[in-house]
Amino acid sequence: ESISSFSGIYDSETKSAVTNFQYFASLPVEHYGVADLMTWASLLTSKGDTSRITHACDTSKTITDARLQILQNNGYWTYGRYLTGKYAMSAEEINRVLGPNANKGENEVKAKIFPIFQRTGAPIPSNRIEYFTPAQGTADGKEAVEAAYDFGFKNGTVIFFASDVDAYDYQVKEILLPYYKNVKTAFDQYKQRRYIMGLYGPRNTCIQVCDAGYALSCFVSDMSTGYSGNLGYPLPKSWAFDQYAGDEFGLKTDPDYTDIDKVAVSGSYHGEEEVKP
């Protein structure tokens, strides 16, 4: 949001602009209206103040009973997990995380899962720009919706397709947009359930893919502050999740060692509280 002029005085117009930004970036409400360090950090770097508290995370670790207890004891109730591949969730894991919700009241905190698609084991790794061809987009879109259906994710579930690569602007236009166009086509052709296409990636990628109409929701890879796609670009208007810092619990030698990425939540999409296989 812009203001009409800068006077050097923190007047009501400036305070309003600051508050609107803080609300948009989902900064803690107690900071609203104050141009403090947390606010400046969010303006100056993509990851912002990494000490800020959130209730969402993503992880490549299987959420066992022990890990679930660790995460919830530390305030994490929303989990990003992979649909397929080496780090995929299982039906048993989904039931472990979401099953207890059925016995909770309306005002009780419920666990949620948001699904991520990133292929592992491909001849070309999915963190290289060469991976993203139109044909791969068709294959990935089909595989993702079929996996989501098999797990029982309902209509309206957002699936976040990862492009974990620092694509330059011309690469977004020439390579990633055709890939995501074909992912969207695969979504539109799937009749069993209607899922919503989202993407994971740097800010510039998220902005362009959503502006093209291929995705409706973004999971922003803001931890990568040095990515060209995060330098000088605003937080996308369609952001749902914002990955901004790592965290870990326990020693790496412990069987229940848990490492996560902290994820801010905009409120436009919260994840899924139940599945119906």
Model-derived segments and spans:
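Acidic, Ser/Thr/Pro/Gly-enriched interdomain connector segments
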Residues: 1-8, 48-62
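Short acidic, glycine/serine/threonine-rich helix-capping segments at coil-helix boundaries
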Residues: 1-42
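Functionally critical loop-and-helix segments that line ligand-binding/catalytic clefts
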Residues: 52-59, 209-277
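Structural recognition of the beta-strand scaffold that forms the well-ordered cores
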Residues: 54-58, 77-82, 112-117, 157-162, ...
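Substrate-binding cleft of extracellular glycoside hydrolase catalytic domains
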Residues: 85-167
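Active-site cleft segment of glycoside hydrolase catalytic domains centered on the general acid/base Glu
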Residues: 165-190
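Aromatic-lined carbohydrate-recognition surfaces of secreted/lumenal glycan-active proteins
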Residues: 190-208, 216
